[in-house]
Amino acid sequence: MSKLSILKQKNKRDVDMTQGSIFRHLITFAFPLLIGNIFQQLYNTVDTWVVGNYVSNEAFSAVGTVGPVINMLIGIFLGLSSGAGVVISQYYGAKRYDKVRDTVHTSIVMTLILAVLFTIIGIAMIPFVLNFMKTPAEVMPESSAYLTIYFAGVIGLMLYNMGAGILRAVGDSKRPFYFLVVSAVLNIILDLVFVLSLGMGVEGVAYATIISQGVSAMLTMITLFRTDSCIKVELKYLKLDKEMLAKIVRVGIPAAIQMAITAFSNVFVQSYVNYFGADCMSGWTAYSKIDQLLFLPMQSLALASTTFVGQNLGIDQVVRAKKGARTAFIMSVVATVILTIPLLIFAPQLVSFFNGKAEVVAYGSMLLRYCSPFYVFCCVNQVYSGVLRGAGNSRAPMIIMLSSFVVFRQIYLFIMANFISNTIIPIALGYPAGWLVCSTLTLLYYRHADLSKSRLVEDAEKRAEASGKSRIKAV
């Protein structure tokens, strides 16, 4: 047997969440995620800041307009990678390391196939998508250029997210954080070089983004190839395992649809916002960037709860999984309330950081002050959707979000725009209205859900592990 085929079950960076302090596991897992996501938002924010201050208002609007499209793309693949992460975390918790290995290699092959498809289909769909969003003619060329470059380099985004999801599934959120920091710093440097020094405009920002994402993907893949644990990637195992692919799809497809639905609903909202012109679009872009920062704590804790619940249900510790869910929810509420207060007080100053034009600041600060008090409701659907996904049930969150963010929100927007008040504030309040409906439905479902029923690890496999039949040996 080759040296590389005899793998350690655990690496020192892996974390077993099936025992020990729940709060400590959640905070130590979520904190690197939070800081990493802040860095990711930082370089997205720098993109926007550079364009808004050193290119043109039209370029600023162009970058803002493509935001929902980019987020929809990211959402689709985050959903698929979360499917792989849930399968890995449950088998890791159940100590079925052979199944972990099979899932890891299936996930990588799936990612490479999807990257090719996303690139081809994405570039072909750009004109249709921008026209569907009612993108103004003056920003159409720059929006199209940005999206074309982004889709051409999407493989970096996809490989990083899948690789990071694999690492997080076994409790390692630190190394994905380190790679994001490197990517963020590189992106900022390239932004300044391409836009300020070389005058490449929106295209320079897009190139900076895909290059930095490519570097983070490379670092993640090198880590997976060089690790000595059960998530090690080896060329000879790179194939699609039908059983593992079916389980990834079972969790990942509904999760991908759920995340795409959220982003797609934003495409609808963006089309309503575009109606009010470039200043409103710019104000909305600034508001959206700040909005994304506020969501980071609850999103990080939602990811932490997914891994925590996955590992604990893998070994059938349902009570501990539910305690983790409750703890993550309380933590997210506290963090969100603390962050909301400065937004209400310093809204104009925050918006002016992105664009100092008076009309843009007025729109952006108004949107912040109307919407930010409702962010606390998002903690419910963010955390408990993460819990349900960790349990292997991503279908229920998908249906709930479809009902709330597509059906309800689009009916609300249509009625507001056509029959009640065709102004920006009633349109913007479609967000809090959707959050409230989604959170109510999610909480009602969770209170009556049996988490153990959606567990992906079969009892037979658990018995096999107890009998010592795992194919991968410990060193």
Task: Give the label of every model feature segment.
Residues 1-30, 88-155, 197-253, 309-374, ...:
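Short alpha-helical transmembrane segments in multi-pass integral membrane proteins
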Residues 19, 23-42, 46, 69-76, ...:
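Residue-level signal for short hydrophobic patches within transmembrane helices
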Residues 28-47, 149, 160, 183, ...:
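Transmembrane helical elements of multi-pass membrane transporters/channels
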Residues 33, 37, 49, 86, ...:
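Transmembrane alpha-helix boundary and packing residues in multipass membrane permease domains
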Residues 38, 42-60, 130-137, 193-200, ...:
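Helix-terminus/linker motif at the lipid-water interface of multi-pass membrane proteins
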Residues 55-68, 144-147, 206, 278-293, ...:
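Small-residue hotspots at the loop-to-helix junctions and early N-terminal turns
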Residues 60-120, 157-176, 270, 283-347, ...:
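Small-residue-rich hydrophobic transmembrane alpha-helices
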Residues 81, 150-168, 176-184, 205-220, ...:
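Short runs within selected transmembrane alpha-helices of multi-pass transporters and secretion channels
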